[in-house]
Amino acid sequence: MSKITVIGAGNVGASCAEYIAMKNFAAEIVLLDIKEGFAEGKAMDLMQTQSLNGFDTKITGTTGDYSKTAGSDVCVITSGIPRKPGMTREELIGINAGIVKTVTANLLEHSPNT
């Protein structure tokens, strides 16, 4: 089995992690977010559904600690900000591109073979 990291523990990231767990695509999932305690809480919520949903995947959450992503076979980036009223798509993609660049640099440092 493998290790999968999901960056961003919002609705998309948490749903992605839940689907990966329910399909038993990985032995371990790391859910990472920048909001303090957010990914840890989502991971605990998902782990509490383990027996109900019939999966054995270990799910852990972390706040910005990319060292916990080390050895990941796959990394899924779902992080970014939503478009705000009055914001152009060009402004949004500029901000989200910066987020993806930072996330990618951190992932490559800890899981260079991802």
Regions found by a protein language model. Give the residues of each.
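Extreme N-terminal starter segment of soluble prokaryotic enzymes
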Residues: 1-4
